[in-house]
Amino acid sequence: MRSLTAAARRPEVLLLLLCILQPSQPGGVPGAVPGGVPGGVFFPGAGLGGLGVGGLGPGVKPAKPGVGGLVGPGLGAEGSALPGAFPGGFFGAGGGAAGAAAAYKAAAKAGAAGLGVGGIGGVGGLGVSTGAVVPQLGAGVGAGVKPGKVPGVGLPGVYPGGVLPGAGARFPGIGVLPGVPTGAGVKPKAQVGAGAFAGIPGVGPFGGQQPGLPLGYPIKAPKLPAGYGLPYKTGKLPYGFGPGGVAGSAGKAGYPTGTGVGPQAAAAAAKAAAKLGAGGAGVLPGVGVGGPGIPGAPGAIPGIGGIAGVGAPDAAAAAAAAAKAAKFGAAGGLPGVGVPGVGVPGVGVPGVGVPGVGVPGVGVPGVGVPGVGVPGVGVPGVGVPGVGVPGALSPAATAKAAAKAAKFGARGAVGIGGIPTFGLGPGGFPGIGDAAAAPAAAAAKAAKIGAGGVGALGGVVPGAPGAIPGLPGVGGVPGVGIPAAAAAKAAAKAAQFGLGPGVGVAPGVGVVPGVGVVPGVGVAPGIGLGPGGVIGAGVPAAAKSAAKAAAKAQFRAAAGLPAGVPGLGVGAGVPGLGVGAGVPGLGVGAGVPGPGAVPGTLAAAKAAKFGPGGVGALGGVGDLGGAGIPGGVAGVVPAAAAAAKAAAKAAQFGLGGVGGLGVGGLGAVPGAVGLGGVSPAAAAKAAKFGAAGLGGVLGAGQPFPIGGGAGGLGVGGKPPKPFGGALGALGFPGGACLGKSCGRKRK
């Protein structure tokens, strides 16, 4: 009894322990009841059928609950003394029979026995599970069975390939792809219009699986190739296949377009060949014979054009060589009878009768033109390049060699046209044995310069050429005479400095040099001594050019010139304002031009445009006119430059004086404006309308007489139409001929 009582208390202790222990959560439903503590751990003799891995023993039916749902200790058939009475502990997790029943019910829902892993040994019902196990990929469920929810399980054709019967026939050959989840809306799509068999190898327009891509890729069915089904396209089938192996739409035999092969490519080649024309028929295929045909035309077989034959060389090359040879002249004389060699340079050729008998000299070029039989009798041609034609050499090569040889002259021949050094027969090789080449070259060069003929008089004009220009003759030595052009040039240059020193009445000698009796006045200032010479009556035709050059070369204030230089000195008849027949100028005698009155060359240049003036009434008789200081001694008045500037400005208006004839500008001191005649500037202005009249005494403040003074109408001047010469007296503007008011303005 004692042992039974002690044994009966053990469940109480175990219950107490169960109250203290916390239930294990990770165990989950599977294995909660089964998989308790193995038998024999807490209850000796429990064995594998008790709380072991399998819970209930093999083939053992679970005990039914006792009366009232509770089993008293040691009572009933299911007493605690029986091993394995209650799986998973004394009363299970729920306590008593009810708890055990609940545990069994939960275990039944969890699945068949044998799936769970035994929990940790200890109190029954607290076993730890590893969680849900993902079944491995396999053949899945059978046909007609709903596939499970686990990814990859239950779908037909789990692995690529393989057509499964039944439900799997809808997607033959398309299985679940590794790494691609299913059930997320990703479904294989059939090609447009392809029906249910799209994607099946060999069925439908799609060619099936592509090389390098796993089956099922791309996820979306690929699009049709560009231009598929159109009437005009590349001619290639899509992906190289057609539906059912039949050629696709718009397919055609032969090579596809654009590959460079086929009729289109041949047509293009023929079109290009047509531009070049058809090849002529050559003797040998591909080798045309040079002839009248088009040079280079391909033969029967397009290839090498005609080969230049023995025919004449290219005309262009021959012409070029001939043109070059022509620069040095042809050998021999004028084309005639004889051939260079026989009568070539020798008999009547340059040499014997050539430049010699009638050569320049004796019968100077003209009489016996260069040479009796000079180049003319014997002409290069008959026997020269002709009789002894230059071997097999072509004319072009011969001409080229001859042209080059002509530069250095021909080699001397032996005898009269004898056998040349290197040639055979008369004429020999062109250029060898032809002595005319050198003379011809010299003659050609001389021809550029022209032959010197016998001039009319030696030196007058370089000798005129003879009848036929030849070698320079004995004619006058060129250069002895004064050519018109050279003389004109020299005269023009000399005109800048004047002709020769003038002589003047009393060259440059005044009462007191630089002072004069009355500075710049004289008895009748501006009249002068001797006849004043007609203005411009000096040099005739050349006056204009000389005056123009003199005007350009005039020297302003402070520049002295030697005696008699045009512009200031008195010269012989040259147009000017000087006294006597002196050189045009303003000073008397050979005075040195200086800052006195403005040089008269300007007026002369202006007057020269209108021709020489008429002969003045009086030649300008003054007591001491022109014997004043030769305007060149600078000095008593302000500086030469200032005086010249003032004089130039005053000259624009001028002072009354003898119109155009007297000795103008003989001031007291060179550079100062004297009371004498009209200044050159005024004279230049007045010169447009003719020479001024004589008028009264200048510079005394007198009123301008009618027709006199600077503005009056001079001798021979044409009076204005309205009032004749009374304009000045009547007070009309322009009476004094001030500036542009005199007469009609020029446009």
Swiss-Prot record:
Alphabetized GO MF terms: extracellular matrix structural constituent
Main location group: secreted
Residues spanning the membrane: none
Keyword Thylakoid set for record: no
Signal peptide: 1-26
Modification after translation, per record: Elastin is formed through the cross-linking of its soluble precursor tropoelastin. Cross-linking is initiated through the action of lysyl oxidase on exposed lysines to form allysine. Subsequent spontaneous condensation reactions with other allysine or unmodified lysine residues result in various bi-, tri-, and tetrafunctional cross-links. The most abundant cross-links in mature elastin fibers are lysinonorleucine, allysine aldol, desmosine, and isodesmosine. Hydroxylation on proline residues within the sequence motif, GXPG, is most likely to be 4-hydroxy as this fits the requirement for 4-hydroxylation in vertebrates.
Intrachain S-S bonds: C737-C742
Positions carrying Hydroxyproline: P188
Entry keywords, A to Z: Disulfide bond, Extracellular matrix, Hydroxylation, Repeat, Secreted, Signal
Stored InterPro entries: Tropoelastin
Gene Ontology CC: one annotated term: extracellular region
Allysine: residues carrying this PTM: 105, 109, 252, 271, 275, 324, 327, 400, 404, 407, 445, 448, 489, 493, 544, 548, 552, 606, 609, 645, 649, 685, 688
4-hydroxyproline sites (modified residues): 34, 65, 87, 165, 178, 181, 201, 298, 302, 335, 365, 370, 375, 380, 385, 462, 478, 513, 566, 575, 584, 593, 599, 630, 719, 733
Highest taxon of the lineage: Eukaryota
Compartment annotation: Secreted, Extracellular space, Extracellular matrix
Function recorded in the entry: Major structural protein of tissues such as aorta and nuchal ligament, which must expand rapidly and recover completely. Molecular determinant of the late arterial morphogenesis, stabilizing arterial structure by regulating proliferation and organization of vascular smooth muscle.
Entry similarity comment: Belongs to the elastin family.
Subunit structure: The polymeric elastin chains are cross-linked together into an extensible 3D network. Forms a ternary complex with BGN and MFAP2. Interacts with MFAP2 via divalent cations (calcium > magnesium > manganese) in a dose-dependent and saturating manner. Interacts with FBLN5 and FBN1. Forms a ternary complex with FBN1 and FBLN2 or FBLN5. Interacts with MFAP4 in a Ca (2+)-dependent manner; this interaction promotes ELN self-assembly. Interacts with EFEMP2 with moderate affinity.
Protein known as: Elastin
Lineage: Eukaryota, Metazoa, Chordata, Craniata, Vertebrata
Gene from which the chain derives: ELN
